[in-house]
C-alpha cells in the first residue's frame, strides 16, 4: 500500500556462498526477490576471498542477473583489513565483469577505503556508505561524505547510503573480542541527509544517495527512486 519494494541477496560473509537452490546463479534466476549476492572482503569475519574468487562469484552473479533481468550485484561487506579493495581491483583487471556489478559497502570505515572507493567510481563503479549507529557517528559520517564529494570526479551519482537497520551490530574491545551486540536504526538515514544539507549540500543532491542513485544502480531507474 505504501509502494515499498523489498529485495534480498543470496550468500553470506563466508565462501563458498550458502544458497537455496545449490548455486548463486540459480538462486538469482529462480527466486524472484533475489537480485544479487552478499560476501565479505578484507574482514576478519570473512573467508578472505582473493581476486580469482571474486571473478568466479562476480561472473555467476552477473549471469544470473542477466537471465533473470535483475541487477546481478555482488554486495561486498568491507572490513578494515589490509587487503582493502585489492581483490576487487584484481577482479576488474583480470576479467570482463563491469565495475557496476560490484558494490562495496561500509566504505566510510577507514580513510583508505574512502580513497579506494573513489578509484572505483572513476572506473565506473559505485560504493555504499553506512549511516551511523549513534548521533556522533552520524555527524562524523556526514563530514566524511562531504570530504569525498570534494574530490575530483566524485558526485552523488555514484554514491549510495544504507543504514544496516536492525541488523546485528557487534561491539569489539581493544583486543578485537566481541563483547556485545546491538543494532542500527534507520533514523540515521534521515538525520544524515539533514546534516549534509546543513553542511551546504543541496537537498536535491543529498537525497540522491537514498533515491535515484540506488534505483539506477539496481536497474530500477524510472520505476523506483
Each language-model region and where it sits:
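Generic structural signal for hydrophobic
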Residues: 1, 117-120, 196
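Active-site loop-helix segments enriched in His/Asp/Glu that coordinate
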Residues: 1-64, 78, 85-90
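Residue-level detector of anion-binding/catalytic polar loops
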Residues: 5, 126, 202
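Conserved beta-strand edge residues that scaffold enzyme active sites
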Residues: 13-14, 134, 210
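Short Asp/Glu-rich motifs
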Residues: 17-20, 139-140, 215-216
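Short, electropositive alpha-helical surface patch
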Residues: 24-32, 91-95, 99, 183, ...
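Active-site core of metal-dependent hydrolases
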Residues: 43-172, 177-179
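His/Asp/Glu-enriched, well-ordered alpha-helical/loop segment
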Residues: 151-225
Amino acid at each position: 500500500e505504501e509502494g515499498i519494494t523489498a529485495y534480498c541477496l543470496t550468500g553470506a560473509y563466508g565462501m563458498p556462498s550458502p544458497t537455496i537452490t545449490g548455486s548463486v546463479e540459480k538462486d538469482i534466476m529462480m527466486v524472484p526477490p533475489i537480485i544479487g549476492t552478499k560476501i565479505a572482503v578484507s574482514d576478519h569475519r570473512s573467508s578472505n576471498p582473493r581476486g580469482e574468487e571474486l571473478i568466479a562469484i562476480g561472473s555467476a552473479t552477473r549471469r544470473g542477473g542477466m537471465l533473470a533481468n535483475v541487477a546481478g550485484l555482488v554486495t561486498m561487506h568491507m572490513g578494515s583489513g589490509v587487503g582493502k579493495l585489492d581483490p576487487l581491483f584484481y577482479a576488474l583487471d583480470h576479467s570482463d565483469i563491469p565495475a557496476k556489478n560490484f558494490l562495496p559497502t561500509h566504505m566510510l570505515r577507514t580513510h583508505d577505503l574512502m580513497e579506494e572507493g573513489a578509484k572505483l567510481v572513476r572506473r565506473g563503479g559505485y560504493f555504499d556508505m553506512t549511516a551511523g549507529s549513534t548521533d556522533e557517528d552520524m555527524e562524523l559520517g556526514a563530514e566524511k561524505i562531504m570530504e569525498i564529494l570534494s574530490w575530483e570526479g566524485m558526485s552523488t551519482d555514484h554514491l549510495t547510503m544504507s543504514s544496516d537497520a536492525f541488523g546485528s551490530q557487534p561491539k569489539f574491545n581493544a583486543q578485537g573480542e566481541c563483547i556485545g551486540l546491538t543494532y542500527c536504526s534507520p533514523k540515521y538515514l534521515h538525520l544524515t541527509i539533514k546534516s549534509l544539507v546543513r553542511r551546504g549540500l543541496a537537498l536535491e543532491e543529498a537525497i540522491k544517495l537514498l533515491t535515484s542513485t540506488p534505483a539506477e544502480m539496481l536497474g530500477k531507474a524510472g520505476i523506483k527512486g
